[in-house]
Regions:
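Short, low-complexity, polybasic intrinsically disordered segments
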Residues: 301-321, 325
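N-terminal [4Fe-4S]-dependent radical SAM core
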Residues: 11-75, 92-100
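Local cysteine-cluster metal-coordination motifs and their immediate loop/turn environment
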Residues: 79-92
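C-terminal functional modules
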Residues: 335-376
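Conserved C-terminal portion of the radical SAM core fold
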Residues: 193-296, 311-320
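Core AdoMet radical
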Residues: 93-105, 118-133, 147-163, 171-189, ...
């Protein structure tokens, strides 16, 4: 597995891969020791969930709870952004139509229908920068909230540069439940964020954990709380072909995994969480690791979509994959097994003849009724 991940990462970046700094054995050992020390200190003080990929789960924002439970849809309202953050994973220069999961939604009504069809409980408006197209963003927020009311939690991501009193009040009137500011895009200025306090019900800051900004971020946790921020979400920084030059020039130590991530980013996030608890700041901090995003968010998509594809004789795994149990045997053996199912009045939707006479597809719950020695 390790070699396969390294090979995949190497292929993604080609010749540029050689520019990346990966930890030496001694560096890796020190980093693991520091990480273990932080986690040991946090043990018993935080709730760790989702296979150890997310903490602290005790004070998650309403939107984060829905995301973690797999009930969230993210609508990219536009592909354009007016900021050029060094950590951004994509170019953010295209004026794309509203899109999610590679499906375009040309009208708010289309998106409402999608949310209803798949049973979502939360929807976010993202980009790009959604406030570059306020009319479109307002239309989609308004349509979703009008249709679902309190049954749908709606939030919006923004760098805040285009926010003003009037626009924030319009978003509140449209029913927006939560707004998330990326203050890393504005050098951690809080003036626009303060405008949203008391206007939008839930005020959240969501930023990458930038290692060199660790002292600054620790020092402003109290200011965030006093400004009305209710939740701080910290993401692990991830390398992409778009941000490769920016991240590789900063001397970060990179880690192999399902994608290449920044070692120091995770350590910084854990230190911020530790600092917040040690000093009783009262601002819930959520570390959203790349593994959580890549594994559990993808799992949620699979489990939601698979409901429309799974056949009655198939099973769904915890990870959202379709599992088919195939019995192979002589034609006469398959025939006898089918006759046994019929004699027991087993629903014939729970089994199916295969595409060859010696094959039988059965739901796992029927396995106890099968003479396993007769099949292979």
């Amino acid at each position: 597995m390790r070699d396969r991940l390294i090979a995949a990462n190497h292929r993604e970046y080609g010749e540029s891969y050689e520019q990346l700094l990966f930890p030496t054995p001694s560096q890796a050992q020190r980093a693991l020791a520091h990480r273990a020390e932080l986690l040991d200190d946090l043990h018993g003080r935080v709730a760790v969930g989702y296979g150890g990929t997310k903490l602290d789960c005790t004070g998650l924002s309403p939107g984060c709870r829905i995301c973690a439970e797999g009930g969230w849809s993210c609508l990219f309202i536009t592909g354009r952004c007016n900021c050029r953050c060094f950590y951004c994973p994509t170019a953010q220069t295209e004026n794309d139509p509203p899109t999610t999961n590679a499906v375009d939604f040309r009208t708010p009504a289309d998106y409402v229908g999608y949310l209803e069809r798949f049973g979502f409980r939360g929807a976010s408006i993202s980009g790009g920068e959604p406030l570059m197209n306020p009319k479109r963003s307002l239309a989609y927020v308004r349509a979703v909230k009008k249709h679902f009311g309190d049954a749908m939690h709606v939030w919006l991501y923004t760098n805040g540069t285009l926010a003003d009193d009037d626009l924030l009040r319009q978003l509140a009137d449209a029913g927006l439940d939560e707004i998330r500011f990326d203050i890393g895009a504005t050098d951690y200025h809080l003036d626009k964020l303060r405008l949203a306090a008391g206007v939008i019900p839930t005020l959240t800051v969501e930023i990458p954990a930038i290692p060199e900004d660790l002292p600054r971020l620790k020092g402003m946790l109290g200011k965030l709380r006093d400004a009305g921020v209710m939740h701080l979400n910290l993401h692990q920084m991830r390398l992409t072909p778009h941000n490769f030059e920016h991240l590789s020039a900063r001397g970060y130590t990179f880690l192999h995994g399902e994608k290449v991530t920044v070692l120091e980013s995770e350590l910084a996030a854990l230190e911020v969480l530790q600092h917040s608890l040690d000093n009783n700041i009262g601002l819930p901090v959520n570390y959203c690791s790349f593994v959580f995003k890549n594994r559990y968010q993808a799992q949620a998509v699979r489990r939601r979509n698979v409901q429309f594809m799974v056949k009655p004789f198939e099973d769904i795994t915890d990870n959202g994959y379709i599992r088919t149990l195939t019995l192979l045997g002589e034609t006469a053996t398959v025939t006898r097994q089918i006759e046994n199912f019929k004699a027991l009045s087993i629903d014939d939707d729970l089994w199916s003849k295969g595409n060859s006479p010696g094959k039988l597809l059965v739901h796992p719950q029927l396995l106890k009724l099968v003479n396993n020695s007769a099949f292979r």
